[in-house]
Amino acid sequence: MAVGLCKAMSQGLVTFRDVALDFSQEEWEWLKPSQKDLYRDVMLENYRNLVWLGLSISKPNMISLLEQGKEPWMVERKMSQGHCADWESWCEIEELSPKWFIDEDEISQEMVMERLASHGLECSSFREAWKYKGEFELHQGNAERHFMQVTAVKEISTGKRDNEFSNSGRSIPLKSVFLTQQKVPTIQQVHKFDIYDKLFPQNSVIIEYKRLHAEKESLIGNECEEFNQSTYLSKDIGIPPGEKPYESHDFSKLLSFHSLFTQHQTTHFGKLPHGYDECGDAFSCYSFFTQPQRIHSGEKPYACNDCGKAFSHDFFLSEHQRTHIGEKPYECKECNKAFRQSAHLAQHQRIHTGEKPFACNECGKAFSRYAFLVEHQRIHTGEKPYECKECNKAFRQSAHLNQHQRIHTGEKPYECNQCGKAFSRRIALTLHQRIHTGEKPFKCSECGKTFGYRSHLNQHQRIHTGEKPYECIKCGKFFRTDSQLNRHHRIHTGERPFECSKCGKAFSDALVLIHHKRSHAGEKPYECNKCGKAFSCGSYLNQHQRIHTGEKPYECSECGKAFHQILSLRLHQRIHAGEKPYKCNECGNNFSCVSALRRHQRIHNRETL
């Protein structure tokens, strides 16, 4: 069997056509935008996998058009001999000649069966497939038997259910019928995804196929173990109820990548000549063996001339080289943003559509990319697979580990081109640059105030909601932000960590120290545009400007009196509370504010004089 498989591969039996699905222009219009994106992603990924396995010699026209962002139906083939001069080179299968294609309006069951028998492809149980109203399902046989796959390409513009048999004459009005002969494992073996995961561990095609298969089983139970393409197709394409325009499409090609899996599955029917000691996989043909072997050997023969980075295949090198030349051929029609790879464009377009097809089965949170879902699920599992070798701290994402390691190396690769300040994270640079641009993209829906950081907006909104989630464990006082709580703690501890280098005066808050330093320099950068008075900090200017505007936003809840400054309100509230924290050392009198105490102390000073 292994010899026969290698012979089949050498004759071109395993090609891109085995893992591709064509749509006519009319059929393409039935697809939703998200399904078109999925189609593009899967077709390009299938081609990459073929390249990786060494099974693709020349790039198909379909791939070229998909890479250019064009519609795939532009490469719709006319399957009759008269409409395709280069038919034999397209199908790439020497055993199949154009006489296999029957370009007639109607063809009877007997005629098709007669042609099958004439080519030695008679299957006694194949006739049973004709009983199911043209739903040409994958027909199960054992691994040693021939398997007939029927793909019908038909016109849908008439709105007729062309693939149904009429009761009289049992005729099949098909545009054309293409019959290919393959050897495949049983359906039970096809469902052993763990085998395929060894060969394609990160393949999104497998992931999507598993999902669809699970959904199908939940709908139909275990009554039938054969694949029902029409079930998948009707669900995924959004066909109106009662119509079955594509019943005979082999839609599983799009998601199962079955031809390559069939080749790998052959390892379970006998000893094969090429095997790996590293992973236990065996391959029936040398081209299967040599390409995956590069994973274990680390061989990367294709090196970039610009940066020296190496790749296992020239296809991946070509994609990488776009980073140097700046080529971004895939452009978003919504915002004109361009990308180097079509897969990146498809992911980006979900921002505009809002599509989040990957949902967490633990909490229901949905994501636009499968990779984001995998990272999120580690929150539930507690898995942190990325560990720092320096301090053994573990992380859920490799990107977080890379960022953390810069603490140890001191690397700050992101530099501001305005002031030269460098940062260890790109997001930190992006946020910093808003200081120079004045950009404040986060707006409060209550008062319209804008902020440069989302965290600042969140803190501000607590003014409107009254939320104060941070509590002092010493006195029970609550604060809106953790920084306010930290500053408050220093009242209890007496800590003043911020010291002026000029006069030695210490402060509990860094901002107060900054304002203090301006008193030494005489710097007053904040000037009132009404009277020209200047101030050392912006908050002083804001308070001053209320004199001109008459604004008094701070109102006493006891008597209704309003004030320009919040400090004035606090001093006033001590009158209602009877609080007098400032005591005269001479006579023992108490006062509600320090200015009242100072006025009082002048009396004692005059008495001594």
Swiss-Prot record:
The UniProt entry, under Pfam families, shows: KRAB, zf-C2H2, zf-H2C2_2
Q: Note whether Zinc occurs among the keywords.
A: yes
Q: Which PROSITE patterns match?
A: KRAB, ZINC_FINGER_C2H2_1, ZINC_FINGER_C2H2_2
- Entry keyword set: DNA-binding, Metal-binding, Nucleus, Repeat, Transcription, Transcription regulation, Zinc, Zinc-finger
Positions of the KRAB domain: 14-123
Q: Which domain of life is it from?
A: Eukaryota
Q: Which Gene3D superfamilies match?
A: 6.10.140.140, Classic Zinc Finger
What are the start-end ranges of the zinc fingers (C2H2-type)? 274-296, 302-324, 330-352, 358-380, 386-408, 414-436, 442-464, 470-492, 498-520, 526-548, 554-576, 582-604
Compartments, as annotated in UniProt: Nucleus
Q: What is its main location?
A: nucleus
Determine if Transcription regulation is one of this entry's keywords.
yes
Q: Which family does it belong to?
A: Belongs to the krueppel C2H2-type zinc-finger protein family.
Q: What is this protein called?
A: Zinc finger protein 527
From which source organism is this entry?
A: Homo sapiens (Human)
Q: Give me the gene this protein comes from.
A: ZNF527
